[in-house]
Amino acid sequence: MASRGSNRSRQPDNQAFRDFISSGWGPRPGGLPARSEAAPWAAARREALGAHFPGERLVLPAGALKVRNNDCDYRFRPHSAFAHLAGTGADFEPDAVLVLEPLTSPGRNTNTAQTPGAPDDPTHAAPTHEAVLYFRPRASRSSREFYGDPRYGELWVGVRPSLEEVEAATGVRCAHIDSLPDALAKDAGPGAVQLRVVAEADEAITDLVTTTRQKAGLETGQVAAEVDAGLAEAASELRLVKDPWEIDQLRAAVAATKAGFDDLIRSIPRARGHWRGERVLEGAFGAKAREEGNGLGYDTIAAAGNHAN
């Protein structure tokens, strides 16, 4: 039983099975994705955040999956700071971590996403950090992870992106998540590189940063909590003013919301004749939310009579 881990059934573990399960698959899609429209805007946000903390290593986790029941997880939503600064969208990538690595001498960032409106302007402030995106890329189909890991295995959750694909889409250097501990510890210490983490995003990463601080002789406890709060505050305030790309996204969300209400209105006749009419309306609106976005931002808030005034 112990060998099953979190799996509810026992998996075959012999070479014949491994040879069978790893063979006969069709080719994966070739080529690399185009650069994301969000990439240059995310680069500008990272540059703005880094300017507040020159010489410090900034750790921004996406967050972890949360179990709903058995081996089923809730739909994933990354931490807002990660999504905003990585520019990867609202479903990338459980357990990923964006690290803004301090440059020893501020200059042009090695990330290839251009900052909007300031390509080579010498008056533009030099970047203080290089972004590195750590995540778990897809494994080989000959690996045990491919068929044996219900959380990350391709057989269970579909094709995961490669490091090269995410680099192409984001313009951010990517690395395997297994290399994160060494990267956080590099040159850390008093009088050297300091660390800050968005502590609420991922408990495991926060614990890793705490351990790294302890080994490097950096402050922990309340002092570290205040340091981390400064990063969370700066990242949050950065989201207050929307850039042109975000404004376009808000307009698209408004249009999708209107379309959802249009579908809801068309469902009213069927809802009136159904014993759970409110669910008919919720379903109509929710379908549009899934088609045009990631889902509902809020559950239904409905009122009638004096409560609606």
What are these regions (language model features)?
Residues V67-P78, Q214-E219, A229-A234, R272-N309:
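Short catalytic-site patches enriched in acidic/histidine residues
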